[in-house]
């Protein structure tokens, strides 16, 4: 993806300004079967890799990041850099039934 490094740099720059967790992200993070912490999401944003790019997303250019949280569990974060903050759209634990290659690629349906 030609703009891959550009959007990732924008994500990290926006996160240094401020991070806004959208209601959907908070609901997903607080599910009892997930319990994803803010610290885990921030670690994914700071050190994770971009695995999907959504330049035409209705919410604005966004991307899917993969990183690792507590006990090295895989965490996916969908986020969109804005002018003065990073919007965290959702965060979840990827399902091994839907992902392969270390949770980097979706299985074809």
Which residues fall in each region the model found?
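Ribonuclease/tRNase effector modules and their secretory precursors
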Residues: 1-109
């Amino acid at each position: 993806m030609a703009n891959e490094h550009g959007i990732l740099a924008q994500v990290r720059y926006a996160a240094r300004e401020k991070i806004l967790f959208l209601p959907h992200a908070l609901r997903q993070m607080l599910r009892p079967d997930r319990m994803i912490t803010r610290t885990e999401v921030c670690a994914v944003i700071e050190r994770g890799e971009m695995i999907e790019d959504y330049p035409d997303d209705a919410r604005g250019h966004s991307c899917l990041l993969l990183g690792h949280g507590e006990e090295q569990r895989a965490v996916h974060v969908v986020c969109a850099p804005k002018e003065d903050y990073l919007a965290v759209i959702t965060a979840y634990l990827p399902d091994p039934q839907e992902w392969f290659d270390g949770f980097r690629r979706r299985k074809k349906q």
